[in-house]
């Protein structure tokens, strides 16, 4: 019943990291836009940003 782990392509990661560098928090319209752009669900984007913020915080 558990969903498979998403494997992000290097192109997707470049875009996600670029966006994160610019802004650590994403508003919904931007999230919708990124989801469409990267062929990912809004949920995947949201969770990637959550995880990335935790990594950022840990590395501070």
From Swiss-Prot:
User: What function does this protein fulfil?
Assistant: Sequence-specific transcription factor which is part of a developmental regulatory system that provides cells with specific positional identities on the anterior-posterior axis.
Identification of the protein by name: Homeobox protein Hox-B3
Q: Which organism is it from?
A: Xenopus laevis
Name the UniProt key words of this record, in alphabetical order. Answer: Developmental protein, DNA-binding, Homeobox, Nucleus, Transcription, Transcription regulation
Subcellular location(s) of the protein = Nucleus
Read off the PANTHER family from this record: HOMEOBOX PROTEIN HOX-B3, PROTEIN ZERKNUELLT 1-RELATED
Q: Which Gene3D superfamilies match?
A: Homeodomain-like
Question: What is the predominant subcellular site recorded for this chain?
Answer: nucleus
A Pfam family per the record: Homeodomain
- Kindly state a single biological-process term from the GO annotations of this entry: embryonic skeletal system morphogenesis
Cellular component annotations (GO), alphabetically ordered:
nucleus
Q: Which residues bind DNA?
A: 1-60
Q: What is the name of the gene encoding this protein?
A: hoxb3
Q: Name one GO molecular function term.
A: DNA-binding transcription factor activity, RNA polymerase II-specific
Similarity remark: Belongs to the Antp homeobox family.
On whether Transcription is a keyword of this UniProt record, the answer is yes
């Amino acid at each position: 019943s558990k969903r498979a782990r998403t494997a992000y392509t290097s192109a997707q990661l470049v875009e996600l990291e670029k966006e994160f560098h610019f802004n650590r928090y994403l508003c919904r319209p931007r999230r919708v836009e990124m989801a469409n752009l990267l062929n990912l669900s809004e949920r995947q984007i949201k969770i990637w940003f959550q995880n990335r913020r935790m990594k950022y915080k840990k590395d501070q």
